[in-house]
């Protein structure tokens, strides 16, 4: 994760737990793409810390649509309520 932005500790823990649920052969690229996207969102808004909404937005942005179902299930299993950020169940 980038040096210019910091991650909220709880958000970072949830991010790493989400990454663990991704198939091993996709983990590396998923971790890189989603973390860069979350940090990019924060940077564009001139903030310094990645929060849960940024992480959720990044996962929805970087995950191919066909995998949104399993991704949503993984988020629900970790107690991440993506619906509060405007995404449908």
Language-model segments: what does each one mean?
Residues 1-89:
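Non-catalytic accessory segments flanking P-loop/AAA+ NTPase cores
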């Amino acid at each position: 994760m980038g040096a210019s932005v910091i991650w909220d500790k709880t958000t970072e823990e949830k991010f790493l737990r989400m990454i663990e649920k991704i198939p091993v052969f996709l983990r590396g690229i998923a971790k890189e793409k989603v973390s860069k996207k979350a940090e990019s969102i924060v940077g564009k808004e001139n903030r310094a810390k990645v929060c849960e909404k940024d992480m959720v937005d990044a996962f929805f942005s970087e995950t191919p649509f066909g995998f949104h179902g399993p991704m949503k299930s993984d988020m629900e299993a970790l107690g991440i309520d993506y619906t509060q950020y405007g995404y449908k169940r």
